[in-house]
Each structure stands twice: as structure tokens, then as C-alpha cells.
Amino acid sequence: MKFEAILFDCDGVLVDSEPITHGVLRQMLAERGWDMPIAECMRHFIGRTVRSQAALIAARTGRPLTDDWMTAFYARRDAELHARLQAIDGAPQAVRAAHAATGGRIACASGADRGKVVLQLRKTGLDAWFGPHVFSGHDLPRSKPAPDVYLAAARALGVAPARCLVIEDTVTGVQAGVAAGATVWGYCAQGADGGPLVEAGATRLFARMGQLPELWM
């Protein structure tokens, strides 16, 4: 295998969290007066932190985004994730195969807050494969689309970014991996439009996580 390390995004790649997270976000924004379909909510926020959209939220709701509101959002989101979250079909097998193929040089590098990432990996049993190599953009100077989280993951694994394969599902995530100097493949579920991922720099698209081990051999 030409890659020495494999770096996975979390939301939408390893765990099917996006509908849950954005369902809670949509509901809480509706309570503030910004009511929209779930598809519109995901279009505004997927691949981005809620705080990065503070100006948009303030403009649509007429109220600033506060720490208290974020704390309430995290609590409601995490309760729903704990109750309902499942791994993406094929993700456990892909992670296990990546661990074996790289001699354990794998990492989870997410733009989400660390508490969410850790909760999700534990809930799905994927935490055992990543060990200490779990990285959050919230812990770094810049989150995705900046490369910081992928650079931190590569550095911790002792692998040059150019020898890393990044698995992503959003434009901002692909941009982060490309900016880090890694090869980026885009996970694009059947029927989804992969064009934006390719435009952002993904060199390969695939539709099933379970097929991933066949592709890097």
C-alpha cells in the first residue's frame, strides 16, 4: 500500500450523526424564530462549526449566539446521539482493515468538538481502534477548511502528510486534507452529488465504506 497512514473524518464518514445533530440544531433554531427544513439546515451548517455561523444565526433570529445557548445545544445534541447514533454501514470493517494495513497508523481528525467525537467513537465501539489518536479542530488555532487538524494527526503518527490518505465527505473537509498536503478520497453515498468534492480536490470518490479496503490495496 502506498499510504503510510489513514486519517478519517468522523461525522458522515464513520458515524451517521449528521441527521441527528442537524435535527436538534434545526429544532433549537426554530425555537428562536428561524424555522427551516432539515435539508436547508444541513446545507447551511454541514462541514462547519455552529460558532462559525454565528453572524448568520444572529441575522436570521435577531439574537446573538451565546455560550449558554451553545451549552444547551451540546446537551440536547449529545443526548440524542447517545440514544440513536449508529456507525456508517461498513465503517467498522474499513477502520479495522486500515489499522491492519498501516500497522496501527490511523487517526480520527474531526472539525467537531472533542466531546462529541469521543462520545461518537465510544458509542459505536470505534474508539478502541484509534486509541489516543483522536483530534478535534476545536483544540487547534484553526478548524477545517484549514489543515491544522490533519497536520496534527500526521505529526502525532510520525508520518509526512504527503504519505497520508484522508477520508472525507464534505467540501470543507476535503479542502483541509488537500491544504495539509495529503491525498484525499471522498466518501459520497449512492445518489449524492460528488462533483463539489472533486472540485475541492478529492482524487477519488467511492460510495460504500465497506469497499474502501479494496481501493487502497
Q: Model-found features: residue ranges?
A:
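Conserved phosphate-coupling serine/threonine residues in phosphotransfer and NTP-handling enzymes
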Residues: 110
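N-terminal helical cap/lid subdomain that shapes the substrate entry/recognition surface
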Residues: 2-10, 14-100, 115
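Asp-based, Mg2+/Mn2+-dependent phosphohydrolase catalytic module
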Residues: 1-4, 96-97, 102-103, 113-217
